[in-house]
C-alpha cells in the first residue's frame, strides 16, 4: 500500500554522469519498495533516462514526474562571470514537457560555457514557462545564494521575478543533508515564505539509494572529475545524507516544516505528463497528386517489370515466373499498406536511389529487410528473396505491429553525404542522428576505479588484461573464468577492495557518443518530440534518447550504417572500369556477376581469405578448410555457422560430416523424421540452421500463418515458458489436423525449441554472404586492383597495411615501393599490373603534404632530384622530418642515389631550397645563378661521401617508416649461414611446402618473444621467427631454454633446429626447438 506522505522531487539517475549512481529502472523498483506513490527524475541538464524511467515507474504502478536540474544565469551578460545558480524544472503537463525539450535543446545549442557546462538564462525560462513548476535550488538557487550573501536587494529582485512570471508555480526549496549554512538558509526562507506567501517544499537531492552507497558515490564523482581521492577531495561537494530516505524519515527531518512535506504530494498531484507510446510519426513523402499507397504500388509494379527482365532475360522463363512474383509482390504490398507503412518504404527508396545515382556505394541488403520483394523491386536491396527462400514475415509481421527496420550499408567515406541529402529534403530541424551511451565495462571500471585510488598504471593494465574481451563480460564472470584473477581477488587485499567497489559501479553510464548509424527523420521539428544534444560548439545534433528509447516517442529510426568493404568493392570496380573505359565488354557490374562460378569456390577452399569480407579470421579459415564450400548456399551457411552457438553445440560438426558423406543426412534426425521436412531442410543437409526454417516447419506442420510462426520463433528465443506452453498446445493441435501424431509433433516442437536459440536470420546471412562472394570474386579475377583498393580503405592503419602487403607477397603480386615520381597518395595499379605503393601509407607524413607533392609533380611530370622536389612543393610543409621519412621509405630512390647519401645531404638540400625560394620572392635574379652554382659544387661533396649505412640500418628505416621490410629483409644478409650449416632452410621454403622431414633447421629473425611460467612452475618461451613475409611460431621448453636463453633477443638472426608440426586444420607450422645457433 502506497504511503501518500511524501514524494521525492529531486532525484538523479546514472544519466547524471557527474554524480548519479542508480539506473532509472532500479530507482522505480526502490520507490515501490518504499511505498512511494510517485517519484521524480531530475537529471543534470538532460532527459537521457526519461523514457526508461517513465516506463519503469508505470510498470511498478508509480506515477512518474519529469524534471531537469539546470544551471541558470540571470541573463547573457553574466555568462562570462561564471556566476550561475541552480534551479529545478518539473513538467506539470504535456505543454511543460515540450518546454523542457525546447529548453534543453536550446541550452545545448547555444548555452555552453567551458567552465560551467550547459546552462539556461532567466529570459529563456520566461519564454518557456508554460506548464512548468520551479523548485528554487535551495542554498544554490539565486534566492539562496543572495540570502546567504546578505544581498537583500537581489533577493527582492528575484522574488519579484518569480512572483511576476511564476506565480503559484514557484516553490522555495529546503533540504537537510548536512551542508554548511543549511539552517541559516532555512530560517530566512521561513520568513520569506510567510511574508510573500510562496510555498516551501522539502527535497533530499538524491544521488544514491542507501546511506552505505556514499563511499562508492565518491568514487563515481572522482572518476568524472579525473582525479584521485587523495589529491582532490575538496572538489567533492556531497554528503552521506543524499540517499533515498523513506517518507517517515523525511517527515521526522522536517517536523518543524510539515507544509514542506505535504507540498511534495501537492506538486506530485499537479504534475501529469501523459506520454503515448503506440503511435508512429513518419515524415511526408512527396507523391504529387497520388496518395502514398497508390504511389508505392505504382513504383513497385514498375520496378517489378525491370527486375523480372534482369532475373529472366529469356521471355518464356519470364512468363513462367511472372504469376509467382506478382502474387508475392501484391501480398507484401497489401500488408505494408494495411499496416500504414508505404511512406517508410518510399523514404528509404529515395535516399538509396539518390546515393546510387551520386556514386555512393550501397550494400546489397542487411538483416531481415532482404526478405522483402518490395524492397528488391524498389532497388532498396539487391537480393531476390524468392531465389533464396527468404520470408517477408521475418521482416514485417502483420500479427506484430512494429515499425519496419531497414538497415542500410553505405560506403564508410560517403555515408555522411546521404545524411546531408536527407537533411536537405526534410529540413535540418527535422533530421538528427541518435545518441549512444558508454558505460563502465568490466575492463574500464577496473582502470577508472584504480586511477581514483592512485594505483600505478602498469598494475591496472595487467589487472584489466586478465578480464576476457568477450561480449557481455562482467567482473563476476571474469573472476569465475580466470584462475589468476580469482587468486588475486582471494589473496590480495588491495585487489579485492578495488574489484568490490568496481562491481558496484560496473554498468553505470559513463559518457555520451554518437550511434554508429541511427538517424531519425521527423514530420515536424525534432524538438517537438525529443530534446537534442549538441557538441561543445553547438554542432552535430543527436537525440537525447538512445536507439532503444527513440521509438517510444513515435519517431522512426533509419539506420545509415558505414561498411568499409563497400568502399573496397567500389574502389576496385572503379579501377577496373576506368582501365577498360574504351571496351564496354570488359566493364563489370558487381551486382550481376554469376553466383555459380566454380573457380570462385575452388579459390575459397584454399582459405586465402585475407581482405575477403567476413572470412578473414583464423577460426573462419579453419571452418572453410573443413567445410569446403562449393556453392553459394554453402557460403550462406558458412556465415550462419560461424557463431558461438553452432560452434559449441556440435551443429557445425554435423553439418560438415553430412555434407561430406561421413554422416547420414536425416530430416532432421532419427527420432523426428518426416517427409514434410525434407524440402525445408535440404539445402542445409537436414540441419535446422535458419530462423526462416523454423518458421516454415511451424507453418507446414501445424498450419500456422508465417506471421504467427514468427511470433512463436520470438517466444522460443526469449524462452518465455508461459507463452511457450500455449504454443505447444496449438502446435500439437495443428499437427493433428495434418494427421501427424502427438508423439512426433511433441518431439519436433522440442527440437525447434532447442534450435531456435542457435538459428540465424537467413536474410542477413544471404546479404553478407553476397558481399563476401563479391570480394572473393574480385580478389580472384582482379587481385591487383582488389588488394590496392583494400589497402586504400585502410591507408591510415599501418598494421592492416602490413597484413595486406604480406598477403600481396603470398599472392606473388608485384609491389613497386614508394616513389615520389610515380606514387600517388593512394595505392594504384599500373598498366603492367604492378601495385604502386601509396605515399599515404608512409608513417609520419600528413595527407596535405603528400597531395602537394603529387600536384607539383603533375605540373612538371617528374622531379629530377631531391632539390627539385623541395623547391617545387610548399616549403612550409616540406620539413626535414617529411624528407627523412620519404628517404627512409625508399620514396626518393628514383633519384638514383643511395639512401645513406640522401639522408646525409637532406638537411643541406632543404636549406638550399629555402634560400633559393626566398631569392625568387625577393626577385634577386642575379642571386639565382650564384645559389645554384654554389649548391651544385657543395652537392657533389655530399654525394661523394663514402661512409654508407649498413643494409640492416637501411632496412630498419624502411620498417620504421612503412611498418614492414619491403625491398629486402635482414635475413638476406645471412644466407651464407645456409652454406655453413648443413640442411638449413629459409622460412619461405616452408611456405612453399618443401618440407619432407619432421626434423628441421630454419634461418630467421626473432620478431616476438614471450616468456611464460607453466602450471608446473617450468619456464618456457613463445617466439615468432620471421623472414620477409613469412612467420613461424617456435616453442622453447625449460630444458632447452636453460642452455640457449642468452641468444634470445628481438631482431637477432638465429638458426632453430627442432621438430616441426603442422596443424591438420589451420595448416600452420609450429617448431618445437631442440637447438639454437
Swiss-Prot record:
One of its GO terms (molecular function) is 3'-5' exonuclease activity. Keywords: Cytoplasm, DNA replication, DNA-directed DNA polymerase, Nucleotidyltransferase, Transferase. SUPFAM superfamilies: PHP domain-like. InterPro entries: DNA_pol3_alpha_NTPase_dom (IPR011708), DNA_pol3_alpha_thumb_dom (IPR041931), DNA_pol3_finger (IPR040982), DnaE2/DnaE/PolC (IPR004805), DNAPol_HHH (IPR029460), NA-bd_OB_tRNA (IPR004365), PHP_dom (IPR004013), Pol/His_phosphatase_N (IPR003141). The keyword Cell cycle does not apply. The keyword Cytoplasm applies. It comes from the Bacteria. It catalyses: DNA(n) + a 2'-deoxyribonucleoside 5'-triphosphate = DNA(n+1) + diphosphate. Its EC number is 2.7.7.7. It is found in: Cytoplasm. GO terms for biological process: DNA replication. CDD domains: DnaE_OBF, PHP_PolIIIA_DnaE1. One of its GO terms (cellular component) is cytoplasm. Gene3D superfamilies: 1.10.150.870, Bacterial DNA polymerase III alpha subunit, thumb domain, Metal-dependent hydrolases. DNA polymerase III contains a core (composed of alpha, epsilon and theta chains) that associates with a tau subunit. This core dimerizes to form the PolIII' complex. PolIII' associates with the gamma complex (composed of gamma, delta, delta', psi and chi chains) and with the beta chain to form the complete DNA polymerase III complex. DNA polymerase III is a complex, multichain enzyme responsible for most of the replicative synthesis in bacteria. This DNA polymerase also exhibits 3' to 5' exonuclease activity. The alpha chain is the DNA polymerase. Belongs to the DNA polymerase type-C family. DnaE subfamily. NCBIfam families: polc, PRK05673.1. This is DNA polymerase III subunit alpha.
